[in-house]
Amino acid sequence: HIDSQNYYEDTVSFSLAFAQFNSQDICIYRSDWNRLEAFNLTTNQLLTERYIAAYKTEPPKHYLDYFHGALYVSPNNDYILDDGWIWHPVASPKVWSLSQWIKHNPFESEDGSSVQTLCYRENWNAVMCWLDDQHVAIWNIELWDQEEFDLKPEPKNRSGIHLLSLAK
């Protein structure tokens, strides 16, 4: 039974993707608005077992203030692309390493060293895809003013297709 709970779950596509890891079939799914799991379909085992304390007055360690969206696995099964958003609301697609998540750090999808925010934009649920193992295309990205944390004013703001590389 897969359930993403009921906190603004209608604002994003249901987070679900399949990948291959060590020649085994993996299901990646959202178990809460800000939490993803990886489940081995071959061995029937949860691969990302972890505990995150409840939010009280301060966010606990590994707390993620991020709504997971549609998931896209890279062609070589090395990365996961997540079309999620943060409060403002602002779209904030991210990528992270599947092998880092499963082999080394069950908190990788929250705040691991491989997590990269690709851009900020006004709208989420955008069309995006992997072009190859290291490059992502995202349609309709408005130009973003990082200092103002808002869209750049017209006429400078041109939407279009943006090609983004994972190379650091």
Model-predicted segments: where are they?
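Short beta-strand elements that form the blades of beta-propeller/WD-repeat-like
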Residues: 1, 23-31, 36-37, 77-85, ...
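Short loop/turn segments immediately following beta-strands, especially the blade-tip
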Residues: 44, 97-107
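Structural signature of eukaryotic scaffold interfaces centered on beta-propeller domains
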Residues: 7-23, 67-78, 121-133
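Surface-exposed loop and turn segments in beta-propeller and other repeat-based domains
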Residues: 2-9, 50-66, 103-122
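Long, mid-chain structured domain cores
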Residues: 1-55
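Loop/turn-rich, solvent-exposed surfaces of beta-rich toroidal or solenoidal domains
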Residues: 124-168
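Structural motif
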Residues: 33-39, 88-96, 145-162
